Amino acid sequence: FDEENGGWVDRDKLEPKHFKKWVEFCKARGLGCDFNPTFFSHPKCDPLTLASPNEETRRFWINHGKACIRISQYLAEELGQPCIMNIWTGDGFKDIPADRMGPRMRYKESMDEILSEPFDFNLVKPCVESKVFGIGVEAYTVGSAEYALSYAAANPGKCIPLMDNGHYHPTEVVSDKIPALLTFFPELALHITRPIRWDSDHVVLLDDETKELCKEIVRCGGLDGRVH
């Protein structure tokens, strides 16, 4: 939505000027502002986005991601605080695909192109986020945990890992993953949520896992800016 002119702008055409009111809101309250591309709920989800075999579809979403890099840079410069820009897609399949490798290779190529957009890594922190499954993609998620961690590890200075504690198998806990990742990554980001049986995004409570997350951030020295 183009707040400046009262019209609609498609996602691949978004510009920093469309977010002036966001900056005004944050400045008035002394806040920074994180940002994310939105790779879902759009006619050009076929249903894949960055992993789509359709070049026109994939190009649209790459351009959206690059636009969001520019917007994130603008937000960080205006507000004087780093902007965490998270990349997550719901790309996947409801049943077992014949080709598990192809979509991930296309996703990687798309990510590489998005991150080729110039930005200051001190100001913009692109993240890559995984998910174990979603409604309609129960059998195969392109951006699996192994994919996301491997991509972040292969792109230091361009990308950091992000963990959402609702995006793993119910028997996994993100609190245990924090020290493992901080052993190898200078920085990481978290989405702290409250999953009930799956990624339901209930309002966060001070429950046992939330306490353990906070304990590990402190114990691992994450309060010095390593954990976002």
Q: Residue locations for each model-derived region?
A:
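Active-site acidic/histidine proton-transfer and metal-coordination neighborhood
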Residues: 9-156, 160
